[in-house]
């Protein structure tokens, strides 16, 4: 697998565009992804019981058509908790896009992100849609879907399948309200491989638990968020089927893209200054390892200690203890980077200057060794700073 300098339109047969329509005061806030042909599609969606209108419409269309040819996204207005009018507006957003592209409405996905409770300004939507073009500036799409994010989040890779080169690209937004189960964010992945929607869904579902479901910024789960994967077959490779080496290679490719996007989201948490990576090793099973890793990275006390560059391993141990995992606690090792701070559940003296260098880094790695099996789990998050409160206190102003 090779990482390339690309964007969401790097796979064959895809294009994208993004622009400022007026959902936000100044920044780009509206965009689309378009495939030359209907693409196989797979999706996972928010587990919040309150579900935004665009997500309902998109999920319904994916189930009905089993294909998707276009995806249109706005940022600044979530169209969530907007009642029957919100549903009507989401269907209209879908219909208007389909009409412009001259395709069936059920082949259009819609997504929105932003302030909950505000109705969609349909005149703004119509104006923005009139300006979007096929084969526009694909890099602008990554900008158009952002809200409180400080940077775009993209990744693109290629992989050989026999004589054919398959390209896969991903883009995501997410900075706050990140505690997925799915994943609290929007993420879109495009690919040019020949693969059915059913097989694509299998690959996505297998990989979401160890990627997007293992990030947390603030413990909040949004109402709008989803991951969609589109693969249009333009490479004309031999079809990728389940339980084959080609499927395993494709799944590994997808896992890499999803994990990279997940890490970029965690690193760009609102007000964040550091990425936190927690790895639990030698656990009884992978589920327990992932639960424990996410417990540690989600601890507010661990997050604030990391922000303060304080190697407070007691907070890490406490988060291990309340993770809900039944493991012996009398033989646990904890490391910050490669420095042991606890061995066999007993504190260890460490060099303060070496530890200061570790804690000043942009990425803090915490390793928890349970000595209770051979499974591994990882989770990602960020520190909790003064700016997180400031950003969210002033979000609507």
UniProtKB/Swiss-Prot annotation:
Site residues (Involved in the stabilization of negative charge on the oxyanion by the formation of the oxyanion hole), renumbered to this chain: 113-114
GO BP of this protein: L-arginine biosynthetic process; ornithine biosynthetic process
Annotated keywords: Acyltransferase, Amino-acid biosynthesis, Arginine biosynthesis, Autocatalytic cleavage, Cytoplasm, Multifunctional enzyme, Transferase
Catalysed conversion reaction: N(2)-acetyl-L-ornithine + L-glutamate = N-acetyl-L-glutamate + L-ornithine; L-glutamate + acetyl-CoA = N-acetyl-L-glutamate + CoA + H(+)
UniProt cross-references to SUPFAM superfamilies, sorted A to Z: DmpA/ArgJ-like (SSF56266)
Residues annotated as the enzyme's active site: 184 (nucleophile)
InterPro entries: Arg_biosynth_ArgJ (IPR002813), ArgJ-like_dom_sf (IPR016117), ArgJ_beta_C (IPR042195)
Site (Cleavage): residue numbering on this chain: 183-184
Residues given in the record as substrate binding sites: 147, 173, 184, 270, 392, 397
Keyword rRNA processing: no
MF annotations from Gene Ontology: glutamate N-acetyltransferase activity; L-glutamate N-acetyltransferase activity
Pathway given in the UniProt record: Amino-acid biosynthesis; L-arginine biosynthesis; L-ornithine and N-acetyl-L-glutamate from L-glutamate and N(2)-acetyl-L-ornithine (cyclic): step 1/1; Amino-acid biosynthesis; L-arginine biosynthesis; N(2)-acetyl-L-ornithine from L-glutamate: step 1/4
GO cellular component, one term: cytoplasm
Purpose: Catalyzes two activities which are involved in the cyclic version of arginine biosynthesis: the synthesis of N-acetylglutamate from glutamate and acetyl-CoA as the acetyl donor, and of ornithine by transacetylation between N(2)-acetylornithine and glutamate.
Subunit structure: Heterotetramer of two alpha and two beta chains.
Family statement drawn from the similarity comment of this UniProt entry: Belongs to the ArgJ family.
Name of the protein: Arginine biosynthesis bifunctional protein ArgJ
Species, as recorded: Streptococcus mutans serotype c (strain ATCC 700610 / UA159)
Source lineage: Bacteria, Bacillati, Bacillota, Bacilli, Lactobacillales
């Amino acid at each position: 697998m090779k990482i390339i300098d690309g964007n969401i339109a790097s796979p064959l047969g895809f294009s994208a565009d993004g622009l400022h329509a007026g959902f936000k005061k100044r920044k780009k806030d509206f965009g689309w992804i378009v495939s030359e042909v209907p693409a196989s599609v797979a999706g996972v969606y928010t587990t919040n019981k309150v579900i935004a209108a665009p997500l309902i419409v998109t999920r319904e269309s994916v189930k009905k058509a089993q294909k998707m040819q276009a995806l249109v996204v706005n940022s600044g207005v979530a169209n969530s908790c907007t009642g029957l009018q919100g549903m009507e507006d989401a269907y209209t957003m879908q219909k208007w896009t389909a009409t412009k592209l001259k395709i069936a409405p059920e082949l259009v996905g819609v997504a929105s992100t932003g302030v909950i409770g505000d109705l969609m300004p349909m005149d703004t939507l119509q104006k923005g849609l009139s300006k979007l073009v096929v084969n526009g500036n694909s890099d602008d799409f990554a900008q158009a879907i952002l809200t409180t994010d400080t940077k775009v989040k993209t990744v693109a890779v290629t992989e050989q399948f026999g004589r054919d080169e398959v390209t896969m690209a991903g883009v995501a937004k997410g900075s706050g309200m990140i505690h997925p189960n799915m994943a609290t964010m929007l993420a879109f992945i495009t690919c040019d491989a020949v693969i059915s929607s059913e097989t694509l869904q299998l690959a996505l579902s297998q990989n979401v638990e160890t990627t997007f479901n293992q990030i947390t910024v603030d413990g909040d789960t949004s109402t709008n968020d989803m991951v969609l994967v589109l693969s249009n077959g333009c490479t004309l490779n031999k079809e990728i089927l389940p339980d084959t080496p080609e499927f395993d290679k494709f799944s590994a490719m997808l896992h890499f893209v999803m994990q990279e996007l997940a890490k970029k989201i965690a690193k760009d948490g609102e007000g964040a200054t550091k990425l936190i990576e927690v790895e639990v090793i030698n656990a009884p099973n992978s589920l327990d390892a992932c639960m424990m890793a996410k417990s540690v990275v989600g601890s507010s006390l661990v997050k604030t200690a990391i922000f303060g560059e304080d190697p407070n391993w007691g907070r890490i141990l406490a988060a291990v203890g309340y993770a809900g995992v039944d493991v012996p606690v009398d033989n646990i090792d904890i490391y910050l980077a490669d420095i042991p701070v606890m061995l066999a559940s007993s504190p260890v003296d460490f060099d303060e200057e070496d530890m200061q260098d570790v804690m000043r880094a942009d990425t803090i790695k915490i390793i928890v060794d349970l000595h209770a099996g051979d499974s591994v789990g990882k989770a990602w998050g960020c520190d909790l700073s003064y700016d997180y409160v400031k950003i969210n206190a002033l979000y609507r102003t």
